[in-house]
């Protein structure tokens, strides 16, 4: 048994569940402390011997797991001009799985011993992981069924990973989908739209910030792809009152961007072709 102060109960449960999650055989506990056994299923990205798991965001530490024990990695022990330092200092949730003896630990067995051997292991693994991240994201993009899905996939991955400069630089090198350029070079995540066919043709951007009550409206020539949870693309059916539905949607969701493709059928088809999207991928209202 472990006596704790009542005020420390939640901290104790969180720390205990973090320690026990890497145990191959879970101990018998007479209270539910919410241990989620370690797996790759909850990872943003993963490889054979690493993963990035941001499930608990602010509490997700960078760790080396050796012998079923997770040792927190201290970024300040690494070269501050290195990609390793940037990834460890600015990122969270990195789990590196090590074999017994890959790293050294202190005599108390409570933390890593930051000798040259241990630091070299961590540095080499982070360098390898960055290469794998680039390869994986490019594979995810290339495996998409359509160009539009590829564009959204890359942008969504950027949202998950790009807080860390070294990861951001790796992901920014991905510019194509099976040889096709994903975005305009001079507009971040932008797709240049086709010229109008008729006077009523347009793509209109409706956007709302959670900090403002008003909804902004702008006709655009370049569509900027943003993470899927903040973006909806709609084909207008003039018989169904699309604009009132868009305003209601943005008011309910508190924030986001809606792109309304309006006008002639020829223009709508041209926009879909430019985006690389099928009608089934776009909302019709």
Name each region found by the language model:
Residues 115, 120, 136-138, 145:
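Extended, well-ordered alpha-helical scaffold/bundle regions in very large, multi-domain proteins
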Residues 1-4, 11:
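GHKL (Bergerat-fold) ATPase N-terminal catalytic module, capturing the glycine-rich phosphate-binding loop
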Residues 33-35, 141, 262-268:
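Short beta-alpha junction loops
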Residues 14, 24-131, 154-223, 244-245:
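GHKL/Histidine-kinase-like ATPase module
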Residues 127-141:
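Flexible helix-coil linker/hinge segments at domain or subdomain boundaries
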Residues 15-19:
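Alpha-helical scaffold elements adjacent to nucleotide-binding pockets in ATP/GTP-utilizing enzyme cores
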Residues 202-285:
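Long, charged low-complexity terminal regions
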Residues 39-41, 140-155:
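Short, highly charged C-terminal tails/helix-capping segments
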């Amino acid at each position: 048994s472990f006596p704790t102060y009542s005020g420390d109960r939640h901290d104790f449960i969180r720390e205990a569940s973090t320690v026990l999650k890497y145990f191959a055989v879970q101990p018998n506990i007479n209270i539910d402390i919410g241990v989620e056994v370690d797996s790759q299923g909850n990872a943003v990205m993963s490889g054979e011997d690493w993963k990035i798991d941001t499930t608990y965001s602010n509490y997700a530490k960078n760790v080396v797991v050796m012998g079923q024990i997770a040792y927190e990695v201290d970024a300040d022990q690494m070269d501050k001009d290195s990609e390793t330092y940037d990834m460890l200092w600015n990122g969270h949730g990195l789990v590196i799985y090590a074999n017994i003896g890959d790293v050294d630990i202190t005599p108390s067995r409570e933390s890593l011993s930051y000798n040259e051997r241990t630091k070299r292991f961590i540095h080499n693994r982070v360098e390898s992981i960055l290469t794998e991240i680039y390869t994986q994201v490019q594979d995810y993009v290339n495996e998409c069924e359509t160009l539009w899905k590829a564009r959204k996939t890359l942008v969504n991955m950027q949202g998950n990973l790009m807080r860390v400069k070294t990861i951001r630089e790796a992901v920014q090198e991905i510019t194509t989908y099976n040889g096709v350029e994903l975005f305009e070079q001079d507009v971040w995540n932008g797709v240049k739209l086709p010229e109008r066919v008729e006077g009523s043709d347009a793509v209109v951007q409706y956007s709302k910030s959670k900090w403002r009550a008003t909804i902004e409206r702008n006709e655009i020539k370049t569509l900027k792809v943003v993470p899927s949870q903040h973006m909806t693309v709609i084909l207008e059916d003039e018989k169904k009152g699309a604009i009132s539905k868009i305003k209601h949607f943005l008011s309910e969701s508190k924030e986001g961007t809606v792109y309304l493709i309006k006008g002639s059928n020829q223009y709508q088809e041209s926009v879909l072709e430019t985006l690389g999207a099928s009608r089934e991928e776009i909302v019709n209202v």
